[in-house]
């Protein structure tokens, strides 16, 4: 269930709220990636409650003030029961506040949109029973950020410069505290020499602190010939720092084949240099698994998207390939993505607002994996949908989707099983 609404208190003051309630009851393997050991079926119950409140002040006579404050809370409880296994449950709660102001001003050599603000949130995790894979602890995260997006007055050029300061602190009763902080600048530029062509480039830095699970988990990872491979805590994990560079181009053509059609194409290349990259190592000799830092890692890849819209059909096509390598040893890290092509076609059925859809996801075999890890075969997964958007009631929408229609058994490039055949119902009404 999802609901949201807003109210205009005055012309300058607005407020709103949203609520999302989710419940799921299922019977599933304790760990779907295991084929040995205690991996019987578990009764699993999941309940998630998300709530958000926001207030916005935007006076029409002052282009420098457009401030929005948001309070949010997310609470997730997962309880699992199984035969011959102690019940386990865990609760994850995230609460935070975000304040941002956007200012519009004209300062040579163009128009500026300034965005600046702050965010604070706390994540808390509490396990019970045998849920040692999810350690007790909390994380406090504080951010300050600033960005200036400038549109040149006399040239078709957009320039973005900004910076973000992040401060991270985690606590676990057994391991104590971990603190980290980082200033992450970024810059981007886009040029549109014609109405149909756009070229862009960017460079940005970021940091990622280790999660509680990466530092503290100590449960069974998997079984091999009846013997367990355990997670080993690593309290010496360092935060990950990286620099990403991206370059690409896009085109947009209107009236290509018919009067009302549009073709959009966009493609880009990205490369990331990471320091203290957080990866996972599986030691089969000692039967243990743990997270560790790769001193220097290289991640790179390609993204391409195409979108064709017309009165007769809509077609979206996307392609991605991502590689990851230890820059020192030249070994694959196995956290990339093999050649993956996604095709999404929607065709109107009649003139009453009904559309039929077909989505195909095609993935090549994953061969650039860690040394000793198995290669994953390629796969093709097809999904079908039927949606209804009545012309007379534009605020209503309903759809039914059959995901993985042929119940294909496959794993993605990281070895995670894909969901089986699933039927989803969706409806939306706005007033």
Predicted regions: what is each one?
Residues 111-204, 209-211, 220-224, 318:
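Signature of Gram-negative outer-membrane beta-barrel scaffolds
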Residues 152-154, 159, 259-275, 290-369:
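Gram-negative outer-membrane beta-barrel transporters
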Residues 11-12, 58-66, 104-113, 151-157, ...:
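Short loop/turn motifs that connect adjacent beta-strands in outer-membrane beta-barrel proteins
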Residues 246-250, 419-431:
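Outer-membrane beta-barrel "beta-signal"
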Residues 66-80, 200, 236-300, 309-313, ...:
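Membrane-embedded beta-barrel scaffold of Gram-negative outer-membrane proteins
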Residues 12-64, 72-94, 130-132:
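Flexible loop and strand-edge segments within Gram-negative outer membrane beta-barrel domains
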Residues 21-25, 73-77, 120-126, 163-169, ...:
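Transmembrane beta-strands of outer-membrane beta-barrel pores
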Residues 32, 167-169, 177, 191, ...:
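Surface-exposed extracellular loop regions of Gram-negative outer-membrane beta-barrel proteins
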């Amino acid at each position: 269930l999802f609901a949201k609404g807003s109210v205009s208190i005055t012309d300058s003051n607005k407020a709103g709220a949203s609520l999302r309630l989710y419940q799921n009851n299922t019977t599933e393997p304790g760990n779907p990636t295991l084929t040995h050991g205690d991996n019987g079926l578990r009764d699993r119950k999941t309940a998630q409650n998300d709530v958000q409140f926001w207030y916005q002040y935007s006076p029409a006579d002052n282009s420098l003030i457009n401030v929005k404050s948001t309070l949010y809370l997310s609470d997730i409880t997962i309880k699992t029961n199984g035969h011959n296994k102690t019940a386990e449950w865990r609760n994850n709660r995230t609460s935070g506040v975000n304040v941002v102001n956007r200012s519009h001003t004209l300062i040579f050599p163009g128009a500026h949109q300034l965005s600046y603000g702050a965010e604070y949130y706390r994540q808390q995790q509490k396990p019970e029973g045998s849920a040692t894979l999810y350690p007790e602890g909390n994380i406090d995260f504080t951010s300050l950020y600033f960005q200036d997006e400038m549109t040149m007055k006399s040239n078709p050029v957009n320039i973005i410069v900004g910076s973000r300061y992040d401060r991270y602190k985690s606590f676990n009763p057994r391991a104590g505290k971990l603190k980290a902080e980082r200033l992450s600048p970024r810059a981007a530029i886009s040029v549109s020499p014609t109405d149909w062509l756009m070229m862009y480039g960017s460079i940005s830095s970021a940091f990622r602190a280790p999660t509680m699970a990466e530092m503290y988990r100590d449960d069974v990872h998997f079984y091999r010939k009846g013997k367990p491979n355990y997670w080993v805590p690593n309290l010496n994990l360092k935060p990950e720092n990286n620099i990403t560079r991206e370059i690409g181009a896009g085109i947009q053509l209107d009236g290509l084949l018919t009067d009302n059609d549009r073709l959009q194409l966009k493609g880009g290349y990205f490369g990331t240099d990471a320091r203290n990259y957080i990866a996972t190592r599986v030691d089969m000799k000692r039967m243990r698994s743990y997270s560790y830092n790769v001193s220097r890692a290289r991640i790179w890849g390609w993204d391409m998207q195409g979108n064709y819209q017309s009165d007769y059909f809509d077609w979206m096509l996307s392609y991605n390939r991502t590689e990851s390598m230890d820059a020192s040893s030249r070994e694959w890290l196995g956290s990339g993505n093999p050649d993956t092509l996604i095709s999404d076609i929607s065709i109107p059925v009649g003139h009453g607002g009904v559309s039929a859809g077909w989505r195909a996801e095609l993935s090549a075999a994953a061969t650039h994996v860690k040394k000793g890890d198995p290669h994953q075969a390629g796969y093709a997964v097809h999904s079908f949908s039927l949606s209804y958007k009545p012309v007379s009631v534009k605020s209503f929408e309903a759809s039914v989707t059959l995901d993985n229609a042929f119940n294909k058994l496959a794993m993605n490039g990281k070895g995670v099983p894909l969901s089986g055949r699933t039927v989803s119902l969706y409806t939306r009404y706005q007033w």
